[in-house]
Every structure is written in structure tokens, then in C-alpha cells.
Amino acid sequence: MADESQKTPWLVQYSSKYPNEHPRNLIPALCREFYNLGWFTGTGGAFTIKYRYKIGITKKRNHWKRRNQRNRRNQDEYYFAPSGVQKERIQPEDLFIHDSEDKEIAHPPPEKKLKRSQCVPLFMFAYSMRGAGAVIHSHSKYAVMVSLLDQEATEFRITHQQMIKGIFNSKSHMYHNFHDLLVIPIIENAPDEADLQEPFVEALKNYPETSAVIIRRHGLYVWGKTWQETKAIAESYDYLFDLAIQMRKIGIDPAAKPKRCHLKCCQGAES
């Protein structure tokens, strides 16, 4: 009798050819998690991980010798989930891989007819301008909702919330504190992802502290030094967005400094 994986091949989302922490195994597994969070439904969203490919070495006559003498340095590879597919069903073989010069070095089997994500150029900006190790493009409904709270706003602001401590400050290279005023740029949506490149780059330049960019009526891009950090930051943002929406419903400004905050806590904080 055939096992479940033979009856439904899409359930096989792990390849024994690669380590557990390799992007070919991580990306399908995490895409399924992000789908369950509502970030990747309807084939939306995108995900990428930077991976340091280590050239193999062998021990010979008590000296370490690289197998590949033509390139003596470790190489960075960038793995991307494909576009327009059921993200919860992605397989290890379905990924696109680019080198540090943004040249495609591997792609899915041709018979699958998978497409490269239009998010790739934006991902590469996060890699090159922020030193990211992973980037999530989420279609979170909370990110969309906070972009609509004030449709003239070019920023989302929130302060004095514990989960702000889960957000990395790209300028100070430290995590934010509870009393910090967290500011995230909001850019306008466009018909095609390619049209977002210029405003996205401007947001990165104008907001050196941010680890995310919100796209109005669309979603957000969020990054971190590792996939673990990126995932945790994205979850923290989602919590804060939801919280801000609920606060607005009861007439509380998420960006307002509380009257009863201890003065010592707020020394040096933005007002």
C-alpha cells in the first residue's frame, strides 16, 4: 500500500540531501508556517534566505586543502521561493538561487514552469543596503489595516509597548526598548512590484533605523540578520499592528506617550 507521501507528493517538504537548516528545507517549512499565519494565502507573499556556501576541504599531509582551487573564498547564495504558487506546498526543488551578483545559478525543474518572484530586486536591496540574512514579504492583513488608519500618513508609529523590544534597530544594531517610538515608513502601492523599487530604496535611505517597510493596501517587507531573527521580528510587527488597530478602536493613540509612564523609563526617549 502506498504511503501518504506517494499519494500526495506535495506533503514531502523535506529533502535528506540537505541539512535541516539548509534553505531548501527551511523555506518550504517556513512558508507553510507563514501561510498558517495568514501572511502567504492565495499564493501571495514571498520569502528569501541568504546562505553561506562553504567550499569543501580535505585533509592531506596534515594540511587543509580546498577542493575548489579556482575560488578560495566562501560564496553567498540567495534562495528565493517561486511566485504564483501555493506557498504551503512548495518543495525543496522549487527554489530559485542567485549568486552575490544577482545572477541565477539554479532554478526549479523546467517541467514545473515556475516563475521567479517579482520581489527579488527588492529583496536584493534589503541584502545590499541592510546586510539582511533573510527577508519576508508578508501580505498580513494587519499591515494592510495600519496603512489605512490614516491614508495620508507616510509612517506608522507606536510607543510604550513591550513587544517593541522584539524589533531590531538597523542603525544602532541593537533591539529597541519598551519606551522607544517605533517608526516604520509607509510607501504607496503600485500595479507591479518593479514600480516599488524606487520608493523602497528611498525608504531605506530615509529611515536608517527601520527593519521593515509597509506598502499601503498591500503588505510589508521585513528583514533581519538571520532567518530566526527575521521571523521573530515579523511576528512582533504583526502583534504591534494588531494592537494599534485595537487601540484606535477604543480611542487610544498608539504613538502617544502615556501620562503615567515613569520618568526614568522615558529619559532619552522621543516625545
Curated annotation (Swiss-Prot):
Q: Which reaction does it catalyse?
A: 5-(methylsulfanyl)-D-ribulose 1-phosphate = 5-methylsulfanyl-2,3-dioxopentyl phosphate + H2O
Q: Which Pfam families match?
A: Aldolase_II
Q: Which GO terms describe its cellular component?
A: cytoplasm
Pathway field of the UniProt record reads: Amino-acid biosynthesis; L-methionine biosynthesis via salvage pathway; L-methionine from S-methyl-5-thio-alpha-D-ribose 1-phosphate: step 2/6
Coiled-coil residues: none
The catalytic activity of this protein is classed by the Enzyme Commission as: 4.2.1.109
Question: Per UniProt, which keywords does this protein have?
Answer: Amino-acid biosynthesis, Cytoplasm, Lyase, Metal-binding, Methionine biosynthesis, Zinc
The GO terms this record gives for MF are: methylthioribulose 1-phosphate dehydratase activity; zinc ion binding
Q: Which cofactor does it need?
A: Zn(2+)
The EC class name is lyase
Q: Where in the cell is it found?
A: Cytoplasm
Residues the entry annotates as binding substrate: C119
Note on how the cofactor is bound: Binds 1 zinc ion per subunit.
Listed GO biological process terms: L-methionine salvage from methylthioadenosine
Residue positions binding Zn(2+): H137, H139, H218
Matching entries from NCBIfam families are given as: salvage_mtnB
Q: What is the role of the protein in this entry?
A: Catalyzes the dehydration of methylthioribulose-1-phosphate (MTRu-1-P) into 2,3-diketo-5-methylthiopentyl-1-phosphate (DK-MTP-1-P).
- Family membership noted in the UniProt record: Belongs to the aldolase class II family. MtnB subfamily.
Q: What is this protein called?
A: Probable methylthioribulose-1-phosphate dehydratase
Look up and give the organism this protein is from: Nematostella vectensis (Starlet sea anemone)
Instruction: Name the lineage.
Output: Eukaryota, Metazoa, Cnidaria, Anthozoa, Hexacorallia
